[in-house]
């Protein structure tokens, strides 16, 4: 499921693979109203993961800590993986996020759930125009979790090992 607006290539990748997806525009569901939208989609039981950009590309807004907490709570309630696209990591210039290991820190759903994958772009951070360099960070709990569907399709392993050795490789 896509929390829009988002990066259109992500939907294109899903379409190329022939999968269905759901999406909604977050502008209509800011703050506590986000819970309603997530509940509507996730309660059907057919969503395995959700993705959003924060700071957002292309609209350049940021989800609040309250909204990230709601996303984390819903991910826990419905056992859904949150893919957090942090392509513009630490580029919320309303506060100084430029000192590593010192507060304030990048806002992240990782504070509220263990069902997360963070995707961080080195290309943006190091201004490598055209080059694609990135980091994927998976929570320890999710990394070591086994899913019957992945075992059936890929022949075993934890989520993390399948992600690294089958999906990315």
Task: Show where each model-derived region lies.
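Hydrophobic residues in well-ordered beta-strands that form the structural core
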Residues: 2, 23, 82-84
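A short helix->loop->beta-strand "cap" motif at the edges of active sites that frequently abuts
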Residues: 19, 77-80, 114
């Amino acid at each position: 499921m896509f929390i829009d607006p988002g990066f259109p290539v992500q939907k294109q990748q899903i379409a190329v693979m022939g999968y269905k997806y759901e999406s909604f525009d977050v502008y209509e569901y800011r703050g506590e109203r986000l819970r309603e939208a997530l509940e509507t989609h996730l309660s059907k039981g057919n969503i395995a993961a959700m993705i959003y950009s924060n700071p957002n590309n292309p609209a350049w807004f940021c989800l609040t800590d309250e909204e990230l907490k709601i996303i984390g709570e819903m991910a826990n309630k419905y056992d859904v993986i949150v893919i957090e696209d942090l392509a513009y990591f630490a580029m919320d210039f309303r506060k100084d996020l430029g000192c590593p290991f010192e507060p304030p820190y990048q806002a992240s759903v990782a504070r509220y759930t263990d069902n997360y994958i963070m995707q961080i772009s080195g290309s943006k951070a190091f201004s490598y125009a055209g080059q694609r360099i990135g980091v994927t960070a998976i929570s320890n709990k999710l990394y070591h979790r086994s899913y019957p569907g992945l075992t059936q399709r890929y022949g075993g392993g934890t989520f993390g090992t399948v992600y690294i050795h089958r999906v990315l490789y």
